[in-house]
Amino acid sequence: MATQKLLLPYHFTHLDQKALDFVIDTFSRLENITVTVFNAYTPIPEIDTAATSVTGKLKGSLSYLSQKIKENETALNEVKDKLIEGGFAEKQVNCIFRPRKKDIAGEIIDLVASDHFDTIVLNRKHARVTRFFSGSISHKVIMSLKDVTICIVS
């Protein structure tokens, strides 16, 4: 049987933790599966902070954002470790942490298409049901992809 590829978009919320727990509980006993944990972050703009006094004040904010990105990368690797502790072999788990060029839904759709994922595990906010069907990431992904199993954890 061919190896199944599962994508777990992760953005450090409590709902993402629920999706992570679902993946561990449901898929960790399978040997023919790989899990990719994915996070696309907003890149920090390139600004010459020494040019003027106004842009010089941005240096602290840009430094904070750079630090936050590094912390998120470390946290994503901790998610990988949780998957391994949950029963996946190390060779079954990958991380993708990259700057985004589109909205989150577009990044997920492009990654699924380029890397041929079989399953995606998403979550949705506990908000009005109309948001689920109107403008959410889950809705955009569901409407855009074909021949992919999508699990929604709420």
Label each region the model flagged:
Residues 119-140, 144:
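Glycine-rich, Arg-bearing micro-motifs that act as flexible, cationic patches
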Residues 58-74:
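A short acidic, glycine-rich active-site loop
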Residues 2-61:
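Small/aliphatic-rich secondary-structure junction motif
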Residues 22, 71-79, 107:
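Short, solvent-exposed amphipathic alpha-helices that sit
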Residues 142-154:
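Short, flexible loop segments at boundaries between secondary-structure elements
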Residues 81-119, 139:
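Structural beta-alpha unit
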